[in-house]
């Protein structure tokens, strides 16, 4: 084997092996074993990215190898670019010396044999030392690049937000009707924190009646909750009756929709009044309860779902209109069993959803993917409604019927 040749092992990717096997590299193959190639001579070359401003076969002005771009004011290969950068950054050139009086010919074969002549040629062809950044400048440049990249990303997000449609005049009118219906039927309004009363700590801590699934029912807490359940249900009914599209439906469908959504809307109204400081929910705008009190007072595992929803929604900063539109979407659910006007109800819900989405665009929340995340809360509320229906059946077995308010039974009994 000629002394000028070298033998090395080269681990290649599938794409690189294909290139080698097809003779697309300047190598001589002596053999291969398990994807590792014994290369005699030059190392396998795999075509990399070449900028569009370079000719296909443009050569490095320093060594004559294939050029990869415009580096430090000259068209060079990656090898000469890296050599020049390292030399300047580490101040290596004072230690370079030539054995042949600085007269070496630099090409892609000899470029690694004499560092002094290679560096000398780099400067001769015009490579600029002042363009090589030291560590601090390089970090500053990298930071600037990252900042510009982040700015472009934010600009793209902002541009996409700006381009999203906002409510039409007709949708604004619908939004106003729904919002006014909610505000008129939402107990205590925005003053609920000032007007709420905390359920005494000793209530809801003494389970008396065993409930299924390991739950307990504190009858005193249950009695307190029954005092506010009737007005809470009444407010949900009043909300629905203030929507013209609901009132135009057959009475039978109105009843089915109300029975289906009542717990969901009451849960939503409680969840948006979650207070992180006291870790309580305020029911019907007046009674603040802890997770344990709500659980022991009859709701069992359903209370966990409502509290978890409250914790999640606290970061959304929903306004009255968004809460109102969520309620309208829950009310007009066309998949409730027994409905006769399915297509009509579905069309109403689609109208609410479209106006809702456009209102979200108008509000311009700073939460990524706000709209789909908010829609997931509709699914969570539907699950709460389904869990409560199951829980109600167990409660009817465990608790005396006279403890349940008549309207409560009317709404939640099948």
Curated annotation (Swiss-Prot):
GO terms for molecular function: nuclear receptor activity; RNA polymerase II cis-regulatory region sequence-specific DNA binding; zinc ion binding. A zinc finger (NR C4-type) spans 60-80, 98-122. InterPro entries: NHR-like_dom_sf (IPR035500), Nucl_hrmn_rcpt_lig-bd (IPR000536), Nuclear_hormone_rcpt_NR1 (IPR050234), Nuclear_hrmn_rcpt (IPR001723), ThyrH_rcpt (IPR001728), Znf_hrmn_rcpt (IPR001628), Znf_NHR/GATA (IPR013088). One of its GO terms (cellular component) is RNA polymerase II transcription regulator complex. Residues 170-414 form the NR LBD domain. It holds the Pfam family zf-C4. Residues 1-59 are annotated as: Modulating. CDD domains: NR_DBD_TR (cd06961), NR_LBD_TR (cd06935). Induction: By thyroid hormone. Its main location: nucleus. Transmembrane segments: none annotated. Residues 60-134 bind DNA. It is found in: Nucleus. One of its GO terms (biological process) is positive regulation of transcription by RNA polymerase II. SMART domains: HOLI (SM00430), ZnF_C4 (SM00399). Belongs to the nuclear hormone receptor family. NR1 subfamily. Composed of three domains: a modulating N-terminal domain, a DNA-binding domain and a C-terminal ligand-binding domain. High affinity receptor for triiodothyronine (T3). This is Thyroid hormone receptor beta-B. It comes from Xenopus laevis.
């Amino acid at each position: 084997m000629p002394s000028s040749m070298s033998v090395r092992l080269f681990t290649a990717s599938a794409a690189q092996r294909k290139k080698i096997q097809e003779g697309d590299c300047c190598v001589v193959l002596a053999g291969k074993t398990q994807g590792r190639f014994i290369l005699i001579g030059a190392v396998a070359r795999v075509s990399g990215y070449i900028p569009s401003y370079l000719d296909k076969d443009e050569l490095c002005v320093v060594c004559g190898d294939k050029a990869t771009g415009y580096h430090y004011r000259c068209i060079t290969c990656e090898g000469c670019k890296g050599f020049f950068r390292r030399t300047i950054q580490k101040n290596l050139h004072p230690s370079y010396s030539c054995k042949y009086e600085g007269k070496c010919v630099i090409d892609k074969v000899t470029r690694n044999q004499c560092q002094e002549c290679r560096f000398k040629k780099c400067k001769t062809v015009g490579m600029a030392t002042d363009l090589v950044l030291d560590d601090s400048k390089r970090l500053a440049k990298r930071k600037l690049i990252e900042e510009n990249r982040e700015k472009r990303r934010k600009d793209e997000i902002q541009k996409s937000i700006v381009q999203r449609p906002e409510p039409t005049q007709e949708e604004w009118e619908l939004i106003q009707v729904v919002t006014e219906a909610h505000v008129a039927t939402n107990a205590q309004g925005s003053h609920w924190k000032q007007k709420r009363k905390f359920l005494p700590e000793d209530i809801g801590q003494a389970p008396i009646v065993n409930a299924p699934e390991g739950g307990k029912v504190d009858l005193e807490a249950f009695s307190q909750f029954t005092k506010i359940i009737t007005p809470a249900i009444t407010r949900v009914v009043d909300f629905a009756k203030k929507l013209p599209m609901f009132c135009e439906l057959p009475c039978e469908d109105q009843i089915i929709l109300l029975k289906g959504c009542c717990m969901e809307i009451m849960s939503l109204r409680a969840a948006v009044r979650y207070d992180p400081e006291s870790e309580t929910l305020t029911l019907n705008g007046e009674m603040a309860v802890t997770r344990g009190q709500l659980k022991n007072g009859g709701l069992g595992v359903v209370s966990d779902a409502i509290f978890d929803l409250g914790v999640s929604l606290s970061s959304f900063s929903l306004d009255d209109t968004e809460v109102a539109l969520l309620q309208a979407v829950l009310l007009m659910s066309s998949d409730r069993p027994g409905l006769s006007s399915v297509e009509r109800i579905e069309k109403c819900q689609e109208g609410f959803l479209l106006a809702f989405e456009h209102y979200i665009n108008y509000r311009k929340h700073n939460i990524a993917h706000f709209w789909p995340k908010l829609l997931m809360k509709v699914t969570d509320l539907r699950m709460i409604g389904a869990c409560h229906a199951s829980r109600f059946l167990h409660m009817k077995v465990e608790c005396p019927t006279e403890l349940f308010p008549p309207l409560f039974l009317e709404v939640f009994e099948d």
